[in-house]
A protein has these predicted regions:
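Basic/polar N-terminal segments that are highly enriched at the extreme N-terminus
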Residues: 1-3
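Conserved nucleotide-sugar phosphate-binding/catalytic loop shared by glycosyltransferases and other
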Residues: 33-80, 87
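Active-site and donor-binding regions of nucleotide-sugar-utilizing enzymes
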Residues: 5-12, 17-27, 68-137
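Generic secondary-structure signature for well-ordered alpha-helical cores
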Residues: 28-31, 59-60, 93
Length: 137
């Protein structure tokens, strides 16, 4: 039987901590495989370069997507989201997941959701819509 591929998108330490049990469950399921897409603060030394945390936990990273974290202007946010859509879209087109899991409401996740939607990839948006200050979705 062909395993179903579940893409997991994470953009920061807080999301990753909450996604950890989802990743473990997929990893332990005989009919599922995960493809971990890491972006945002995970790749930024100013935020602790938490990419190392993920690899120490034993998870394989399928793709690293650099998205500039310049919040100096609204235009910079628009450019970051646009770049994210293009970059994440390329990754999703390559790995061809059966679905993607995106956590919360940050702009990196927003980029992932837009890319997935345009590629007809079903999306599981976990804890979206919670009241946040500065959220993107």
């Amino acid at each position: 039987m062909k395993k179903r591929i579940i893409a997991i998108f994470t953009g920061n330490r807080a999301e990753y901590g909450l996604q950890f049990p989802i990743l473990k469950a997929i990893d332990n399921h005989p009919e599922l495989e995960y493809r971990l897409i890491v972006s945002g603060a995970h790749l930024d030394k100013n935020f602790g370069n938490t990419l190392d945390e993920i690899t120490k936990d034993g998870f394989h990273i399928s793709a690293e997507v650099k998205i500039e974290m310049d919040a100096s202007s609204l235009e910079a946010n628009v450019q970051a989201i646009g770049t994210g859509i293009l970059s994440i879209g390329k990754v999703l087109n390559k790995i061809k997941p059966d679905m993607i899991v995106v956590y919360a409401d940050r702009f990196e996740g927003f980029s992932a959701v837009i890319a997935a939607t345009q590629l007809n990839i079903p999306t599981a948006h976990v804890e979206g819509g919670d009241l946040t200050e500065g959220g993107a979705l």
